[in-house]
C-alpha cells in the first residue's frame, strides 16, 4: 500500500511538471489508478490525505483532457475536507471545480473561503468572473479594479480589463467600455477577445457594419472564437 501511495503521488507531481499534455495525461492516469487502489487498504489516518491528492489529480485531469472530471475532483476534495484534512488550497480547487461545472454560487462561496486563507491575483479574477456570471457586477468590479491597480501579472490585468469592458458594455457605459478594449489592443494587438468585445459594443449601439468588422478581426486572429462565430452566424440569417 505504501508503494502504491508513493507511486501515485510521484506520478501526480511528474504530471503537473510536464509541458507535454499527452505525457501529463499518462502520468495523471497512473496517479489516479494507484491512489484509488491505495484507498481500498489505506490506514484510516491516511485516507484524508489520499482523498485530497486524488481530488487534485482529478482536477488536473479536468484541465488537460476533453472529458470532465470536475465532479470527481469535488467529490474527493469534499471528502478530504469533511474528514479533517487541512490544506489551504482546497477551497480554491473546489471553487474552480464548481466553476467548471457551471455552479457560480457554490464557486463564489468556495473562493470567498479561499480568500480568507490565501489571497492571490488569480483568485481575485476567478471570483470576479463568477460574480459577473450571476449578475453581481458591482462586486465583480471591486475585484477587477484591484487587479488593474495592484497586479504585476500583465495577462491577468488584460483579463480584468476585458471583463470590465464587458460589464461597462452591459451597463451601456460605452465610452469606458471602448477605452478598456482599446487599451487591451494597445498592449496586445492580437487579442481576439478585445475585438469581439468591441463588436458587441457596436452591436449594442446599433452599428452592425462596425460590429461585423470587429468580429471578423477576432476570427482572423482566432478562427474558432466561439463568440465571434456565434454572432456572425446569428446575423447571417
Give, region by region, the residue ranges found by the protein language model.
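Helix-start (N-cap) detector for alpha-helical repeat units in TPR-like alpha-solenoids
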Residues: 1-2, 45-48, 87-89, 121-123, ...
Amino acid at each position: 500500500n505504501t508503494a502504491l501511495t508513493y507511486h501515485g503521488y510521484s506520478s501526480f507531481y511528474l504530471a503537473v511538471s510536464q509541458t507535454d499534455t499527452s505525457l501529463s495525461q499518462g502520468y495523471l492516469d497512473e496517479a489516479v489508478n494507484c491512489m484509488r487502489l491505495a484507498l481500498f487498504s489505506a490506514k484510516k489516518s491516511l485516507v484524508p490525505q489520499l482523498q485530497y491528492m486524488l481530488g487534485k489529480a482529478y482536477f488536473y485531469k479536468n484541465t488537460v483532457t476533453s472529458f470532465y472530471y470536475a465532479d470527481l475532483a469535488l467529490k474527493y476534495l469534499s471528502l478530504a475536507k469533511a474528514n479533517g484534512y487541512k490544506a489551504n488550497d482546497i477551497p480554491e480547487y473546489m471553487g474552480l471545480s464548481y466553476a467548471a461545472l457551471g455552479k457560480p454560487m457554490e464557486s463564489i462561496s468556495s473562493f470567498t473561503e479561499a480568500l480568507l486563507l490565501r489571497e492571490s491575483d488569480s483568485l481575485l479574477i476567478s471570483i470576479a468572473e463568477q460574480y459577473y456570471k450571476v449578475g453581481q457586477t458591482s462586486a465583480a468590479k471591486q475585484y477587477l479594479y484591484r487587479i488593474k491597480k495592484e497586479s504585476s501579472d500583465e495577462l491577468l490585468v488584460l483579463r480584468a480589463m476585458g471583463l470590465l469592458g464587458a460589464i461597462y458594455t452591459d451597463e451601456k457605459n460605452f465610452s469606458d467600455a471602448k477605452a478598456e478594449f482599446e487599451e487591451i489592443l494597445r498592449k496586445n494587438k492580437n487579442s481576439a477577445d478585445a475585438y469581439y468585445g468591441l463588436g458587441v459594443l457596436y452591436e449594442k449601439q446599433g452599428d452592425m457594419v462596425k460590429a461585423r468588422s470587429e468580429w471578423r478581426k477576432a476570427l482572423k486572429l482566432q478562427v474558432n472564437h466561439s463568440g465571434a462565430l456565434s454572432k456572425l452566424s446569428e446575423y447571417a440569417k
